[in-house]
Regions:
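NTP-binding/hydrolysis catalytic cores, primarily Walker-type P-loop NTPases
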Residues: 358-412
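Conserved C-terminal guanine-recognition region of P-loop GTPase G domains, centered on the G4
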Residues: 30-34, 68-71, 85-95, 245-246, ...
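Canonical P-loop GTPase G-domain recognition
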Residues: 99-149, 156, 309-314, 319-368
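Conserved nucleotide-binding/hydrolysis micro-motifs of P-loop NTPases
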Residues: 17-21, 50-52, 84-87, 106-109, ...
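Switch II of P-loop NTPase G domains
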Residues: 2-3, 26-29, 52-68, 234, ...
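N-terminal accessory targeting/assembly segments
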Residues: 1-110
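Flexible beta-alpha connector loops of hexameric P-loop NTPases
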Residues: 18-22, 54-57, 115-119, 160, ...
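Conserved G1/Walker A P-loop phosphate-binding module
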Residues: 146-262, 275-276
Length: 412
């Protein structure tokens, strides 16, 4: 292993816009944010419109020379391309520019390697990196061996990726075996949770939309949050109290981004399953972001890929205090500011109202002999009105379909 370099890398960004490219400007803005998240200093960027990518060097020969001059003049150490490069393009660009060249996918994988905290998260990132690198290692070992550390070559934790092509397939097999064991245990825990009467809520959204802030607001506990991309990788599930004795579970997991590498979606499938096996998906959107509609589409596309579109949803437009003249595009929705003083009470009420729409209304009469059963009912139902007539208490409220059997305990 080569020691990871600590110095800040000076990077130059390159993007090519084809006639059918969507949201190109947004994609380039994100590339800059990704580079900064990875710890780089972005010195400049270059964009070009073309009918198609150059099969050898991605950009045309004339523009390639302009980039080379910029690299030399600004002492650039790394060029980051806003597209997935072929192994051939990668080699040719490095030979022409004389510096390390990585693409958007490799940059995202690198950030995931930095962010991974749990054993499972590190395994998932390592697997995604190896799957990405494998076709680039075959016949391209020399190119990759020249990458003397830094952005694009970091592995989970402190060490760098092992770029020995002879062992990569064995590493992939070994990691997949380890992840199967982890997933078996996760599946057991998930199965118990599915059998539980507790209502399950999952947070989903674009990276940096504020999911962890909402998690912290509702739990009054510390979940790492920051104004940066991919602050959270590992799925976190916590119990929260919404009203009276009513408890639910709340799961936060990795955020999405445009052009999320397929290797990551595949490797993190078990983690993303945590948000799939819920009763309600809360889609968090940054209302203050001018590109929020594009972010919505990206998340919905990935949800479709993961077969999650049929799960009941609530859209939370977060950071509403920073959004002027905002018009929601998804329903049902609620405008919130997760960092406002009253945010917890507001969020609790918003969730309860959405749950009422999904639950079954009920009214029961409770005789004194069965009053002791009310406590258990309060743990799974939203209690509305309670009235006493003589010794009989009439309770109305809402309860999930899967828990309606609990009402039978009160019937004669």
């Amino acid at each position: 292993m080569i020691e990871t370099e600590k110095k800040i890398e000076r990077v130059f960004l390159v993007g090519v816009e084809l006639p059918d490219t969507e949201n190109f400007d947004l994609s380039m803005e994100e590339l800059q944010s990704l580079a900064k998240t990875a710890g780089a200093e972005v010195v400049g960027s270059y964009s070009q419109k073309r009918e198609k990518y150059d099969s050898k060097t991605f950009v045309g020969s004339g523009k390639l020379e302009e980039i080379r001059q910029m690299v030399d003049a600004e002492e650039i150490s790394t060029v980051i391309v806003n597209n997935r490069l072929t192994p051939r393009q990668n080699v040719n660009l490095e030979e022409s520019l004389g510096v390390k060249v990585i693409d958007r996918m490799q940059l995202i994988l690198d950030i995931f390697a930095m962010r991974a905290r749990s054993h499972e998260g590190k395994l998932q990132v390592h697997l995604a990196q190896l799957k990405y690198l494998l076709p680039r290692l075959v016949g391209q070992g020399i190119m990759l061996s020249r990458q003397a550390g830094g952005i694009g070559s970091r592995g989970p934790g402190e060490s760098q990726l092992e770029l020995n092509r002879r062992s990569v397939r064995n590493q992939i097999h070994d990691i997949e075996r380890q992840l199967k064991a982890v997933e078996k245990n996760r599946a057991t825990v998930r199965e118990k949770r599915l059998e539980s009467s507790i209502f399950k809520i999952g947070l989903i959204g674009y990276t940096n939309a504020g999911k962890s802030t909402i998690m912290n607001c509702l739990t009054s506990k510390s979940q790492y949050e920051a104004d940066e991309l991919f602050a959270t990788l590992d799925a976190t599930t916590k119990n929260i109290n919404l009203s009276g004795q009513l408890n639910v579970t709340l799961t936060d997991t990795v955020g999405f981004i445009q052009d999320l590498p397929t290797e990551l979606v595949s490797s993190f499938k078990s983690t993303l399953e945590e948000s799939k096996n819920v009763d309600l998906l809360v889609h968090v959107i940054d209302a203050s972001d001018p590109h929020h509609e594009e972010h919505e589409k990206t998340v919905l596309d990935i949800m479709k890929e993961l077969d999650m579109l049929d799960i009941p949803r609530l859209t939370l437009y977060n950071k509403a205090d920073k959004a002027e003249d905002f018009t929601p595009t998804l329903t049902p929705y609620s405008l919130i500011s997760a960092k406002a003083d009253n945010s917890r009470a507001v969020l609790q009420q918003v969730l309860l109202e959405r749950m009422k729409e999904l639950f079954l209304p009920f009214t029961i009469k409770v005789a004194p002999a069965k009053a002791y059963k009310i406590h258990d009912l309060e743990k799974v139902a939203i209690i509305g009105n309670r009235e006493y007539t003589d010794d009989v208490e009439t309770i109305s409220g809402w309860i999930a379909e899967k828990n309606k059997w609990k009402l039978e305990e009160f019937y004669d």
